[in-house]
Amino acid sequence: MIIMKKIKKQIQNYWDKQPCNIKHSKKKFLSKEYFDEIKKKRYFVEPHIKKFANFQNYRGKNVLEVGCGIGTDAIEFIKNGANYYGIDYSSESIKICKTRLEAYNLKKKKALFFTGDAEYLSNLSELKKIKFDLIYSFGVLHHTPNMKKCFHEIYKLSSKNTIIKIMLYAKNSYKNYMLDITNFRYESQ
């Protein structure tokens, strides 16, 4: 148990020091232009995200994103009218999400962000009260030490009508191949 806590603390420190996609823009840090450039690059590199997420289909619906990072997909759900709830293990990423809301003038929209562990989602009392229409996670859960526990927690927060959309990177994918041969972890930069 102590070893697992140490590993989790190392994971949290890693993502706090270099939130995912943080270096994908040369624009003024945390400006709207900065976030626009990050969004443009994300959806250029992974254009399938928009179809997978179907951001526009969740107007007025409750969406939980597990592993929201710096909020690129969060903003799309929020702009399309979702009641959005995002959780990430990195407190730095959550701070950036909140700044991003301000940059897009979306602070008054229904959006709540939490720092937390996906292996203990149901411990967040705020989430237990909500009936989620969508639980979404893109490229996150395979980074957790106990992915099975994350799935169990997601199941606890779902109902019979909840849509669950989870994307995990395949070990033998083109993306992983390119990262391996270049020894470059672009996604975490």
What is each of the regions a protein language model found here?
Residues 1-36:
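N-terminal, positively charged/glycine-rich alpha-helical extensions of SAM-dependent methyltransferases
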Residues 32-61:
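Conserved alpha-helix/loop element of class I SAM-dependent methyltransferases that forms part
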Residues 61-66, 70-121:
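Class I SAM-dependent methyltransferase SAM/SAH-binding core
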Residues 120-129:
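Short conserved loop adjoining the S-adenosyl-L-methionine
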Residues 136:
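A conserved beta-strand element that flanks and buttresses the S-adenosyl-L-methionine
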Residues 139-140:
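Short catalytic micro-motifs in class I SAM-dependent methyltransferases
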Residues 148-163:
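A short glycine-rich, Lys/Arg-flanked "PGG" loop and its adjoining helix->strand segment in the class I
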Residues 163-188:
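Conserved class I S-adenosyl-L-methionine
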